């Protein structure tokens, strides 16, 4: 039996750009018009292999369908010899949608026939339109955008909120990606995308909602503690839970200690340090002075203290500027064993608040400072040494004493640790050291009430502006 078809190895192929992939409406149950080839059933595998770049491929979806009953295929010009029955022996192979959205059936077919893969007259004659009913199946939704470059393979989860950082290549598919994430993760209720950098001292970032709704987290669990927070108005990063646990474990080794958390947020360090539910509670007596400038974070810090049985004599909360808080600790002679400064964007600059520090003449007590910051990634020992020198010099500049860390690393117990990978060229670091005695001889930084009020007012306005930047695209618009 001979079929008048061109040799498949002579057919050109075509790879469609991301814009050729199914739009969000693909997931709505409806009859869609797809271009298709009418082929002999016995050559199905051969066709699929040769035209793999243009054949419709979607996990758990068929690319080959039987011919529909009641449809007249007599217009197809490919002849069958020897009594070959095209109604039984041929199948429809769906081809990916091209740039034909919004056009009628005739325009679609005309446009598709202009593709190089169909220029062979005998192939063009096999082309027909097929109405296939493809309904929504949540289980296959995440695969809709798998061919878009840079679709995130992972994302941060905070309670029922998924946080993604989409690249520009993926933005045309952002609502589709958001829906896919929700479909595959029933416990999630909302997906947000970061649309700007963290540029204020509250560490909040402008975001848009891609799918779902509800940024108020009723309950978020981390290392045995429960937290409430509003993801849009306070800072929370679930990827730092390892760092939270590490510092808590390190600080609670002695039988008793005092901690000053200058940028405490909603309490990821302060709460587990002082919670009566923590395993170390009856072994180590920890008193934590926890501060945050953001009034909303301060409110949730107090709420989380109650949730986790952090008693008032163990966890003392403040709503002050970071520098003012550090001055207060020294002025009131609170001999903290550790200062935590988790504000990576600018924490090293806050070290100027330690200038003119009054050490205890009797004990000579020097607190350990834990400063989080960002710096470049390194590829070898030479680059690492250069990076560490740069980070320490940045701290020295704020302390007002050159060489007090770089030249006295062993004396001041200097340690630099990579906390996590932030980006292709950036790491988050934790720099720990004992407060150098040299800072006592540096002129103290003066904080006037007027300047503090002005600075605090500016920061609060920045925070509210940032919160207002949460995109208000309606759920209806996202789903359309």
Swiss-Prot record:
Single GO cellular component term: mitochondrial matrix
Chief place of localization: mitochondrion
Pfam family, one: TYW2_N_2
Residues that bind S-adenosyl-L-methionine: 244, 292-293, 321-322, 342
Record key words, sorted: Cytoplasm, Methyltransferase, Mitochondrion, Nucleus, S-adenosyl-L-methionine, Transferase, tRNA processing
EC number assigned by the record: 2.1.1.228
Any one Gene Ontology BP term: tRNA N1-guanine methylation
Location relative to the cell: Mitochondrion matrix; Nucleus; Cytoplasm
Record GO terms (molecular function): tRNA (guanine(37)-N1)-methyltransferase activity; tRNA methyltransferase activity
InterPro entries documented for this protein: MeTrfase_TRM5/TYW2, SAM-dependent_MTases_sf, TRM5-TYW2-like_MTfase, TRM5/TYW2-like_N, tRNA_Gua_MeTrfase_euk
Source species, domain of life: Eukaryota
Reaction(s) catalysed (UniProt annotation): guanosine(37) in tRNA + S-adenosyl-L-methionine = N(1)-methylguanosine(37) in tRNA + S-adenosyl-L-homocysteine + H(+)
Quaternary data: Monomer.
Function, in words: Specifically methylates the N1 position of guanosine-37 in various cytoplasmic and mitochondrial tRNAs. Methylation is not dependent on the nature of the nucleoside 5' of the target nucleoside. This is the first step in the biosynthesis of wybutosine (yW), a modified base adjacent to the anticodon of tRNAs and required for accurate decoding.
Family membership: Belongs to the class I-like SAM-binding methyltransferase superfamily. TRM5/TYW2 family.
Record's protein name: tRNA (guanine(37)-N(1))-methyltransferase
